[in-house]
Amino acid sequence: MSRSSSSMATVLVVLMVVSAGGLSPPCAAAAKEEKPVVVLPPAAAPGEAPSADAAAFVRSCCDTALQADRDGSSFCYYHLLPYAAFFEGNQVKVAEVAATILSTNLWVYVDQLRKVQGGAGKGDPNLNACVDDFSVAAGENITREALQSLGRLAAAGNGKRSKEDLENAQKWIKGVEKPYNGGIGKASGCEIGYLFTYSDDLPAQKTLGYTFDTASSLINHIKL
């Protein structure tokens, strides 16, 4: 090969390397935060009532799980009634749908917190802590694992359910509960009660407690 041909080949190799590098994302680029992908079963159409047996089953599940909380039981019932036809007498399916709804509402709430964080709540350390804690609680990996575990528990049936799957779901719901109890880490100052200042900008907070109690109570009533 001539010197000129060799030089040309070298230039082409360099160009190919540079071009390939230009097509790749920079190493320092931050990974995009992903929200968990959750799918609810079809809900009844507005005005469409479930069968009496299906409605009675939802009522029974809610009354049993939230027997000491009449308001919570009522919220649970009307919250889950649109999915009554899906449950087919399976209590774990009820818990699975409640958890799916909670995970969706958590991300709505986190989005609202972040908007306040960039506006009226800028510089508020308690708000910052709550954003951090609820973001961790609603994280993609732990949420996906919990919902997958609930799906397996629902499919397995009584006496065949995995203790590990139940523990995964319980671990997730305990993680969601932590921001209500003063934060996740020792240095965290998340106190949800102090967020009342921003209540007009946090509409999801109005029902988040009931949504959490519904999912938590139903998950903790799952029998292996």
UniProtKB/Swiss-Prot annotation:
Main location as per UniProt: secreted
Name of this chain's protein: Uncharacterized protein Os08g0218700/LOC_Os08g12160
Lineage: Eukaryota, Viridiplantae, Streptophyta, Embryophyta, Tracheophyta
Location in the cell: Secreted
GO molecular function terms attached to this record: enzyme inhibitor activity
Signal peptide: 1-30
GO biological process: plant-type cell wall modification
Keywords per UniProt: Glycoprotein, Secreted, Signal
Superkingdom per UniProt: Eukaryota
UniProt GO cellular component terms: extracellular region; plant-type cell wall
